[in-house]
Structure formats: C-alpha cells, structure tokens
Amino acid sequence: MKFKDSALAHEILDNSDVIIEIGASAHNPFNIKSESYFNVDLPKKYREVYEQESEVLGEGIATVDVEVTGVDLPFPDNYADAIMSSHVIEHFFNPIKALREWYRVIKPGGYIYIICPHKDRTFDKGREVTTISEIIERLDIPYLEDGAQHYTVWRTDDFVKMVKAFGFVVTHVQDVDDKVGNGFTVVIQKQHGI
C-alpha cells in the first residue's frame, strides 16, 4: 500500500540539489526529484519495529544511507537544500534540538519540511497536547531517544506556535497533510542562523 505524493512537497522541493530525509519509509516515499537524496535513520537495533511494519505493508524496507539519530547529523553547515520528515518529529524527546540541528544543515533559503501526526486524527487522540513549557523543560535534559514512542503530541496550531516561539520562520502550513491525511504539514525556511 503506497500513499500518494505530496503536491506541496513537489512544488517546494523538486529539482533541489541535496535532500536529506529523516526516517524515510519504503511504503510512503516522497519521490522528490533531486541530485542527491540521503535517508538518515536510527541505527539498525532501533529500527526493528518500523522495518516489521514496512514488511507488513508490503513495500520492503527503505535503504538507509546514514545511521545516526536526527539530532547529530554528520553533514556540514549549510549543506542541504532541504530536510524532510514524515511522522518522525514526535519521536524526539527534544524536538527543538532536532529542529536546530536540521536548521544548521540546510542552506540559507532552504527548507525543513515536516509532516506530523495530528492529535485528533491518530491514536494520540486521548493524550494531552505537549505544551511549549514542557518542551522548554526538556531542552537541557540529556535523553537517548529510542524512537519507538510519541514523546510529543500536537495539533497544527500548537506546533506552529512552538516553532515560532523558538525563532523559526514558517512559510507553509497544511492543517491536513496532502500525503497521508492523518497529520499536518509545516514548512520552515532558513532565513538566518539561530
């Protein structure tokens, strides 16, 4: 079962030189046209749950080019035109640390393209929304993410408020993402260093 392509992702990102996707999946590829495309994902021992799910969905397992967590990327500053993720940011205990790292790696004018599960359209429905104050408390807590659970839960407006509170510039928002439909899309553009 493959999901449709995102028209918004193609509009913004097609023909980029370098794209990095955090946590790509074979059953839900973005199919963006670029010169270089890297899939960054957790080391193999942490990917077992996702690989089993991909096998069940019948599309095989996405090839991983770089095995690291998404908070410590082995790319130089201003390297990529875009970093993309779909249903990944909620797995970070400290999502701002991840976003700051992704921001470091993208070029000025580049994009961070995020699809995140919407609290009311996923199994997170019964959970409380993660507040900005909770995120602030997590900033200095060292924690090794195992990637298997949702540490954060948002609705579209909560996520947008959070990223803006930390100085990120949001250029595009879809309350219902145009790829899977159970999340929302937020696109951040690099204007200057944070």
Q: What is each residue range found by the language model?
A:
Residues 88-89, 118:
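Hydrophobic adenine-recognition pocket in adenosine-nucleotide-binding enzymes
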Residues 57-60, 67, 96-101, 107-193:
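S-adenosyl-L-methionine-dependent methyltransferase catalytic module, highlighting the catalytic core
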Residues 83-84:
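Hydrophobic beta-strand segment of the Class I
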Residues 14, 93, 107:
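Short conserved AdoMet
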Residues 16-18, 78:
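Nucleotide donor/acceptor-binding cores
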